[in-house]
């Protein structure tokens, strides 16, 4: 299991849900090794001794954490070679971790993983700033605002490449899920999209488009309003790059209404093959989101339905998702 997202996006809060997923899979949670390099910071530096400088502890250990991270990759690679690698739960910010073009150690999942679960957190940058401050007050792990915003840019720039590296693989079972964590504390994140290998189901198109928006934020912002001061971060309707790549590179992409799972479009090899205008109008109410969708998959003028009726739907009981969707929640 590999969870990716910006700093303070809620990666660690997914662990209870991942534990329940392991139970559904019949895998003993105690057999998982947790890979979370940020925890090492507290072993590298005595936070209490820093006084007022404690808020800069993260930056003061950045180089050391990078060294330990690389050593861990090599160690896990060795464990894999001797067939002693445990199940892994990977909570890492690094977006080069386990990418296909990395050196030997970082290709660990490619070489030794059989079933891979990828979780991508989509959290508004302004929310990560607030949550990071609260986390710092509670646990002493502070990050500066510009560092957090830069992490958001790196995260949302890195998600597409890492996603496509895995979703198109033929030799592994790759489950993936994008989760909206811009929700109140204590609530379950919402499933934005999910799938298995070469099929993708999109439930919240507006939130998926935020991946493009969030990677273009103003890292020098000093107010929430200034975060989206750049035009490219505010208007992605004219150029929804990540959505375009999904439709171009993933053989089957299905669009469905979030609350019911009712399907309103199916695109196969880049062509719109199924369409239900009524469900589409219920599911997509935001004008910019409609503009983004119709710029890529515009149905024929006046076409109300192509081989789809109102009963075609995705079933949450047939998925291995962690988030809320389809009007049900399988793992409270």
Task: Briefly describe each language-model feature range.
Residues 2-23:
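Glycine-rich phosphate-binding P-loop
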Residues 27-108, 143-146, 156:
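Conserved nucleotide-sensing/catalytic segment adjacent to the nucleotide-binding pocket
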Residues 30-32, 111-117, 171-175:
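Short glycine-/polar-rich loops that comprise or flank the Walker A/P-loop
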Residues 42-45, 99, 125-133, 186-188:
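Switch/connector loops and helix/strand junctions flanking conserved nucleotide-binding motifs
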Residues 49-52, 132-137, 192-196:
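Short secondary-structure boundary/capping segments
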Residues 55, 113-159, 300, 307-313:
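A glycine- and Lys/Arg-enriched "phosphate-lid" helix/loop adjacent to the NTP-binding pocket
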Residues 81-83, 161-175:
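A structural motif corresponding to the C-terminal end of an alpha-helix
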Residues 172-332:
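C-terminal accessory extensions appended to soluble enzyme cores
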């Amino acid at each position: 299991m590999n969870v990716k997202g910006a700093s303070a996006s809620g990666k660690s809060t997914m662990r209870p849900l991942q534990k329940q997923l392991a139970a559904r899979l019949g895998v003993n949670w105690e057999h998982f090794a947790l890979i979370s390099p940020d925890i090492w910071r507290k072993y590298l530096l005595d936070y209490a001794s820093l006084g007022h400088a404690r808020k800069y502890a993260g930056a003061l250990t950045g180089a050391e954490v990078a060294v330990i991270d690389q050593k861990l990759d090599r160690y896990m690679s060795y464990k894999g070679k001797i067939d002693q690698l445990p199940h892994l739960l990977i909570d890492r910010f690094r977006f080069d971790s386990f990418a296909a073009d990395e050196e030997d150690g970082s290709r660990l999942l490619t070489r030794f993983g059989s079933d891979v679960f990828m979780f991508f957190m989509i959290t508004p940058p302004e929310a990560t700033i607030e949550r990071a401050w609260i986390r710092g007050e509670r646990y002493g792990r502070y990050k500066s605002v510009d560092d957090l915003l830069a992490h958001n840019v790196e995260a949302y720039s890195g998600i597409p490449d890492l996603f496509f590296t895995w979703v198109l693989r033929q030799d592994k079972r790759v489950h993936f899920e994008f989760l909206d964590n811009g929700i109140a504390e204590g609530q379950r994140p919402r499933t934005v999209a999910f799938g298995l290998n070469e099929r993708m189901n999109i439930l919240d198109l507006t939130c998926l488009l935020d991946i493009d928006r969030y990677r273009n934020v103003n890292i020098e912002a000093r107010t929430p309003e200034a975060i989206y001061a750049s035009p490219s971060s505010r208007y992605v309707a004219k150029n929804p790059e990540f959505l375009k790549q999904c439709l171009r590179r993933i053989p089957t992409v299905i669009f469905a209404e979030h609350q019911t799972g009712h399907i309103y479009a199916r695109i196969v090899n880049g062509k719109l093959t199924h369409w239900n205008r009524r469900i589409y109008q219920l599911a997509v109410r935001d004008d910019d989101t409609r503009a983004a969708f119709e710029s890529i998959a515009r149905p024929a003028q006046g076409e109300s339905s192509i081989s789809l009726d109102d009963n075609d739907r995705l079933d949450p009981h047939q998925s291995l998702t962690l988030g809320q969707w389809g009007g049900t929640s399988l793992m409270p």
